[in-house]
Amino acid sequence: MRECISVHIGQAGVQIGNACWELYCLEHGIQPDGHMPSDKTVGGGDDSFSTFFSETGAGKHVPRAVFVDLEPTVVDEVRTGTYRQLFHPEQLITGKEDAANNYARGHYTIGKEIVDVVLDRIRKLADQCTGLQGFLVFHSFGGGTGSGFTSLLMERLSVDYGKKSKLEFSIYPAPQVSTAVVEPYNSILTTHTTLEHSDCAFMVDNEAIYDICRRNLDIERPTYMNLNRLIGQIVSSITASLRFDGALNVDLTEFQTNLVPYPRIHFPLATYAPVISVEKAYHEQLTVAEITNACFEPANQMVKCDPRRGKYMACCMLYRGDVVPKDVNAAIATIKTKRSIQFVDWCPTGFKVGINYQPPTVVPGGDLAKVQRAVCMLSNTTAIAEAWARLDHKFDLMYAKRAFVHWYVGEGMEEGEFAEAREDLAALEKDYEEVGIDSTTELGEDEEY
């Protein structure tokens, strides 16, 4: 089996974890106590979900997941919530004092006290796997635990599980909706530290999700619950091919092979369609062509940036539901001719397709309508460098005055780390710039070969 272990870190990671596991359970017909009614198993015979759930002797299904936070309140909600019986108590790990939005606390002082407990628990989960495929790490960039502890754990996972792939789902600080003043510091420090340890990182920008909820679902004031359920749908689409048998399945390593042209350029942009409210769904027939087209609208992206200003390096379309290859090929052909999609000239073909016959599931009483088919597009585009540029600019404004730096230094960090991290991100922006340059312009340099 190709098992995946999910690691949910900090408040954002844990709350997205709640939304994801709620959805996985609905998709696989697993009850909140972990049991699967026998009538489901007779007809289905689909055991692909064991990539995400392990089964105990008593027939209970337990998520292959760890929830970690440096303070207990958020994880306590899992301990007392609807799904409290789903998880083994040891899978929910909490510290006593939080990281206080401080990367240095998450990474050095508070984080290092708990990291061995977490690794020990992950080791137990890994031992239950016959063929561990890799890790999915959920966290935010802005929080202290999400940034500091994640980067610490990723370093340790690289040491313990060198060849296993590590995918991140990172919550990028929203330009307008900020929860902490020091988010730019934390984001840049964590990106610098995790860059070499992560194989692929899907960024999700809270503000982009807010806008989608407002615009497509008519929710005036979206709560984190609304945001997380939408993010859950996207994560579910990305992982569906690992959990169901389909016509064109996509493996974890396959994502990297197709989406990551260079090790550092590993931040694909995710787009999901259709996001549609129950009222609207009655009146719309969402064809494959329509939802495919919607993926190229910047309004449906998970990160605020404009792909029309960048170039695509690779594009991965994951369909689920009532979709046949013929429709997909037609839709993609139309897009190639009509849309002004620019691919980098060294990567001419660029579309990878996955199809899963399991239609998208929605949480009962949620905001999203139940639809027959949906698509999640993962594209690696140079436009995502805009997101880094925004963060870097904010970092520079604060760092020029050395504002708030003493909090980090007081927790055992050296000021040099800030400069080092900032240089690394400047290099990352430069990498994106160079990747987008046409290769024909470099002919002058090739003469000596």
From Swiss-Prot:
Alphabetic keyword roster: Acetylation, Cytoplasm, Cytoskeleton, GTP-binding, Hydrolase, Magnesium, Metal-binding, Microtubule, Nucleotide-binding
GO MF terms held by the record: GTP binding; hydrolase activity; metal ion binding; structural constituent of cytoskeleton
Cell compartment(s), UniProt: Cytoplasm, Cytoskeleton
Entry annotated with the keyword tRNA-binding: no
Names of required cofactors: Mg(2+)
EC number: 3.6.5.-
Residues annotated as site: Involved in polymerization: 449
PANTHER family assigned to the protein according to its UniProt record, in alphabetical order: TUBULIN (PTHR11588)
Source domain of life: Eukaryota
Chain positions found as N6-acetyllysine: 40
Protein name from the UniProt record: Tubulin alpha-2 chain
Lineage: Eukaryota, Metazoa, Ecdysozoa, Arthropoda, Hexapoda
Annotated catalysed reactions: GTP + H2O = GDP + phosphate + H(+)
One biological process term in Gene Ontology: mitotic cell cycle
Record-linked SMART domains: Tubulin, Tubulin_C
First-level EC class: hydrolase
Free-text description of this protein's post-translational modifications in UniProt: Undergoes a tyrosination/detyrosination cycle, the cyclic removal and re-addition of a C-terminal tyrosine residue by the enzymes tubulin tyrosine carboxypeptidase (TTCP) and tubulin tyrosine ligase (TTL), respectively.
